[in-house]
Swiss-Prot record:
Residues 34-58, 446-485 are cytoplasmic. Residues 2-17, 59-424 are extracellular. The record marks 58-59, 251-252 as: Cleavage. This is Pre-glycoprotein polyprotein GP complex. It comes from Junin mammarenavirus (JUNV).
């Protein structure tokens, strides 16, 4: 250590010698050149590879390119399923045998058996939605019953009527639907079965051909072990679109913006993790993502953002609104959801191919600029998310598209800030400089000299060595072309 300190103290002294300076310069050049040669040889890269080989990369730092990363975003669906009256419905299947549905403060247990609890002679026959008012004194129960029958595809004017218990009786609310696959009721039973399969992904069909089968729905408490299955809710909302909204006017051709958890508009975008994301410290999806969603309607991520954004204001409004406005909410939500995407994912699920459950999304993030691609759904197969390697081509292409989009945007920005005239002047001046530099290197001669004599300026000589102006006679001496004087 003392030798190093002594050496540093002697630097100003030995640098006074020119030879020492030359030695220091040669040493520095040799060291730098040696490091560069080692780097170009690949030795450093080889040791880095040995140190990192076999280690796993976290999803947060999964590198695709130099400045692009593979990142994910997950939704928390708790904000959609609150306990407000007339809120979004919940559907649940327990042990593949018990079916439940919940809407607002009402909860029903749905069962199938061959025991007739209600009879046409003693109970209410339901042929129209207005007849449901004879079944219960609770608006929540009536509202949920009507919405459920609409969702399974029941036509109030063409399909067979069903029964409910008169609200004046003390036994409690219940309604009963004949789903027997017999006689003229067979077509309706198949239609009802199809509707139940769309609503409940694990629907157990206990009705046998040619046997009596009755569906009963009666109030019950919501089981605590029931999961919040938002996919069933999305299917439930879209099933009733033909009845609740015969003329769908929006068809996803509209613009929208994000709001915060209190419902206030934030045109500049809102950080989703503050109220509906599982992952913390996630970046904000601002005007860029919103603009992409306004242009691109074929995206599960955009559908979920629309549902989140609408649900906050809808719930706040519905607390003080009438039954008519409740129906309007159902119509509007149906217009917000992309039916094609839901049906496409449902078909994929039934065919045991990767499908989207609207929970986890991935996107490509540029670490330097902070720009990101539009999140895409992380597909599920066999009840588990696909590995990153299973859709490697997708995120590589998404990375290429992001880089291309960034370069295109940067080029457009530069084109907008730089006048074309200035670009032309710069280009032609560069061409002129290059041409003049070439001519300068070639060395074009400018005048004649008499060989072996001084420059004859200011006179100009002809090929005979005489003055071109005629002042001096021709000397008939050999001449040579010269450039300098």
């Amino acid at each position: 250590m003392g030798q190093f300190i002594s050496f540093m103290q002697e630097i100003p002294t030995f640098l006074q010698e020119a030879l020492n300076i030359a030695l220091v310069a040669v040493s520095l050049i040799a060291i730098i050149k040696g490091v560069v040669n080692l780097y170009k040889s690949g030795l450093f890269q080889f040791f880095v590879f040995l140190a990192l080989a076999g280690r796993s990369c976290t999803e947060e730092a999964f590198k695709i390119g130099l400045h692009t990363e593979f990142q994910t975003v997950s939704f928390s669906m708790v904000g959609l399923f609150s306990n407000n009256p007339h809120d979004l419905p919940l559907l649940c299947t327990l042990n593949k045998s018990h079916l439940y549905i919940k809407g607002g403060n009402a909860s029903f247990k749905i069962s199938f058996d061959d025991i007739a609890v209600l009879l046409p002679e003693y109970d209410v026959i339901i042929q129209h939605p207005a007849d449901m008012s004879w079944c219960s004194k609770s608006d929540d129960q009536i509202w949920l019953s009507q919405w459920f029958m609409n969702a399974v595809g029941h036509d109030w004017y063409l399909d067979p009527p069903f029964l409910c218990r008169n609200r004046t009786k003390t036994e409690g609310f219940i309604f009963q639907v004949n789903t027997s696959k017999t006689g003229i009721n067979e077509n309706y039973a198949k239609k009802f079965k199809t509707g139940m399969h769309h609503l409940y992904r694990e629907y157990p069909d206990s009705c046998l051909d040619g046997k009596l089968c009755l569906m009963k729905a009666q109030p019950t408490s919501w089981p605590l072990q029931c999961p919040l299955d938002h996919v069933n809710t999305l299917h439930f909302l879209t099933r009733g679109k033909n009845i609740q909204l015969p003329r769908r006017s929006l068809k996803a051709f509209f613009s929208w913006s994000l709001t915060d958890s209190s419902g206030k508009d934030t045109p500049g975008g809102y950080c989703l993790e503050e109220w509906m994301l599982v992952a913390a410290k996630m970046k904000c999806f601002g005007n860029t993502a919103v603009a992409k969603c306004n242009l691109n309607h074929d995206s599960e991520f955009c559908d979920m953002l629309r549902l989140f954004d609408y649900n906050k204001n809808a719930i706040k409004t519905l607390n003080d609104e009438t039954k008519k406005q409740v129906n309007l909410m159902g119509q509007t939500i149906n217009a917000l959801i992309s039916d094609n995407l839901l049906m496409k994912n449902k078909i994929r699920e039934l065919m045991s191919v990767p499908y989207c459950n609207y929970t986890k999304f991935w996107y490509v993030n540029h670490t330097l600029s902070g720009q990101h691609s539009l999140p895409r759904c992380w597909l599920i197969k066999n009840n588990s998310y696909l590995n990153i390697s299973d859709f490697r081509n997708d995120w590589i292409l998404e990375s290429d598209f992001l880089i291309s989009e960034m370069l295109s945007k940067e080029y457009s920005d530069r084109q907008g800030k730089t006048p074309l005239t200035l670009v032309d002047i710069c280009f032609w001046s560069t061409v002129f400089f290059t041409a003049s530099l070439f001519l300068h290197l070639v060395g074009i001669p400018t005048h004649r000299h008499i060989r072996g004599e001084a420059c004859p300026l200011p006179h100009r000589l002809n090929s005979l060595g005489g003055c071109r102006c005629g002042k001096y006679p021709n000397l008939k001496k050999p001449t040579v072309w010269r450039r300098g004087h």
